[in-house]
Amino acid sequence: MSGGVSLWIERWMLSTNAKDIGNLYLIFALFSGLLGTAFSVLIRMELSGPSVQYIADNQLYNSIITAHALLMIFFMVMPALIGGFGNFLLPLLVGGPDMAFPRLNNISFWLLPPSLILLVFSACIEGGAGTGWTIYPPLSGVQSHSGPSVDLAIFALHLSGVSSLLGAMNFITTIMNMRTPSIRLHKLALFGWAVIITAVLLLLSLPVLAGAITMLLTDRNFNTSFFETAGGGDPILFQHLFWFFGHPEVYILIIPAFGIISTTISAYSNKSVFGYIGMVYAMMSIGILGFIVWSHHMYTVGLDVDTRAYFTAATLIIAVPTGIKIFSWLATCYGGSIRLTPSMLFALGFVFMFTIGGLSGVVLANASLDIAFHDTYYVVAHFHYVLSMGAVFAMFSGWYFWIPKMLGLNYNMTLSKVQFWILFIGVNVTFFPQHFLGLQGMPRRISDYPDAFAGWNLISSFGSIISVVAAWLFLYIVYLQLVEGEYAGRFPWLNPQFYTDTLQALLNRSYPSLEWALSSPPKPHAFVSLPLQSNILRSLF
């Protein structure tokens, strides 16, 4: 027994294998996502009617919002899209045996559970951190939050930030130094490009967040005055520092999703991606522009009119590379032999709802309009269409695309399609009415509202219950896959009549990337020797 336990500990807790670490990230993200979903349901239940429903304390309500946001951003989307899919797939995409720094990879993951524990403690101690995920002073200052909850949230962010920085360095080194000579950068799979760009954004933006929250920590505990007006500080400085990180952060969340969607749409349209180079440069442009538009979150703080004009124009320019990506996905589908598998359904759902989220983003980019919409439910609807329906749908698309390769087991196709439709209906019923609430002026982060808003709020809360049903159905699908799933061959997503489980299929078909040349699941060291240029690799590109 002790031998079995020690082997288990060595396999999972001391692992240096990128595939096992990727699986750990996905399991961790699944757990955090369920926890964050539970918090979101509490929010929607409180808002299902006017006046007090379940949560009498407004501080508790705001603490739930903070916990929900931080859980979903730092402990669900980032670990899943970057840590999970990135770790598992990147060595396979570049033809390498593992990540460049395997032990660094291990510590990158194991910093996250302590960080999650700190965040949960933060929510449970002295009423929690009722600051929202933005942690603006003076609300997060020592006068408004005198207990340790904000300090614990800051420590949680520090730990998850260090984890992300170490992971980003590992990804960049792996892609630059461990590619097989046959795969030059302009032939790298789009998901590989997405990971590179995301890693660079992390390296450039996270230190700024670390600086801002460290200054806040010293303001709270060591009597400094970075953000204390009484001591000559400026709380607006915190907003500038936070959003210089915060806006690239939203692209850190969505760019890996772009890579996944490009891969799945290409595979299930039976065509190579339309405009590969354009797609790469569009992602690069989005990443660069993301650093010079941060003050569009701050139109209401009293910016100079010329400053507001600049940030409006710069923000609207981001719509250009985003539009290139949307139309390239549509062009990839056009004329293709489309198969509506669960993965493809989620990809098409992503394109549809990301477009809606992008259109409301164009509205909010205008300083004159954002003065009215700032801190209303219009903003909540906008970023949930991009995240709750963008990043999350991309995660499901990637899951259903690669999980037969990862586990070597097939899943129930029918139930997976049912899950897509339940989730699609649920999230739209939840978030589309919030556009109307925002247009009517309902403010965010307040647990009570006038009776006039009751109708749309009730519909929105009903939609959240539908979404929870989809989440439980997903867990059941995973359970069935693990318990009853049939063996998945090397190419689990091909039509059975069109493939044989041999490398001959690679010679006859254009493949998106190298992982399909391997067994399902891949061996711990997938490519012991680097794959050489051959007919197979020529057929890939």
UniProtKB/Swiss-Prot annotation:
It is a multi-pass membrane protein. Its EC number is 7.1.1.9. Its cofactor is heme; Cu cation. CDD domains: Cyt_c_Oxidase_I. Ca(2+) binds at E46. Fe(II)-heme a binds at H68, H384. It is found in: Mitochondrion inner membrane. Mg(2+) binds at H374, D375. One of its GO terms (cellular component) is mitochondrial inner membrane. PROSITE patterns: COX1 (PS50855), COX1_CUB (PS00077). SUPFAM superfamilies: Cytochrome c oxidase subunit I-like. O2 binds at Y251. It catalyses: 4 Fe(II)-[cytochrome c] + O2 + 8 H(+)(in) = 4 Fe(III)-[cytochrome c] + 2 H2O + 4 H(+)(out). Binds 2 heme A groups non-covalently per subunit. Heme a3 binds at H382. There is a cross-link at H247-Y251 (1'-histidyl-3'-tyrosine (His-Tyr)). Gene3D superfamilies: Cytochrome c oxidase-like, subunit I domain (1.20.210.10). The chain crosses the membrane at residues 23-43, 70-90, 107-127, 152-172, 188-208, 241-261, 273-293, 311-331, 344-364, 383-403, 418-438, 458-478. GO terms for biological process: electron transport coupled proton transport; mitochondrial electron transport, cytochrome c to oxygen. Keywords: Calcium, Copper, Electron transport, Heme, Iron, Magnesium, Membrane, Metal-binding, Mitochondrion, Mitochondrion inner membrane, Respiratory chain, Translocase, Transmembrane, Transmembrane helix, Transport. One of its GO terms (molecular function) is cytochrome-c oxidase activity. Cu cation binds at H247, H296, H297. Belongs to the heme-copper respiratory oxidase family. Component of the cytochrome c oxidase, the last enzyme in the mitochondrial electron transport chain which drives oxidative phosphorylation. The respiratory chain contains 3 multisubunit complexes succinate dehydrogenase (complex II, CII), ubiquinol-cytochrome c oxidoreductase (cytochrome b-c1 complex, complex III, CIII) and cytochrome c oxidase (complex IV, CIV), that cooperate to transfer electrons derived from NADH and succinate to molecular oxygen, creating an electrochemical gradient over the inner membrane that drives transmembrane transport and the ATP synthase. Component of the cytochrome c oxidase (complex IV, CIV), a multisubunit enzyme composed of a catalytic core of 3 subunits and several supernumerary subunits. The complex exists as a monomer or a dimer and forms supercomplexes (SCs) in the inner mitochondrial membrane with ubiquinol-cytochrome c oxidoreductase (cytochrome b-c1 complex, complex III, CIII). This is Cytochrome c oxidase subunit 1. The lineage of its organism: Eukaryota, Fungi, Dikarya, Ascomycota, Pezizomycotina. The gene is COI.
